Amino acid sequence: TATGHTTAILSSKVKGTAVYNSGGDKIGHVEDIVLDKESDHIMFAALGFGGLLGVGEKYAPVPWSLLSYSKDKGGYVVPMSEDQIKAAPAYDLKELVKGDGEYGAIREKSYDYYKVPHYW
């Protein structure tokens, strides 16, 4: 537009954004975004779920390509159920980046679980 890019967003604004399934049920939130600094890709969103007030919460690394922003919901929608997210590989946040996610194993497990083609 003449006034600037209207779809740009800071990653700090994405953190905490609600995530919904395609049925409209809230299934979690974006806790953080993991970047691949060598390939310029967003690896995944760390989708926080479970736990109470952050205690016992786990993080499912969901490939970024699966998240679609919904203006109506003011959050992201993923094409899966809450049960599918709960059954997905889940980790502590620090594990997602330690040794490049244990040398890529976390990234590979995540992309394979969600049947998303590898970009690497």
Regions found by a protein language model. Give the residues of each.
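Peripheral interaction segments used for macromolecular assembly
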Residues: 1-120
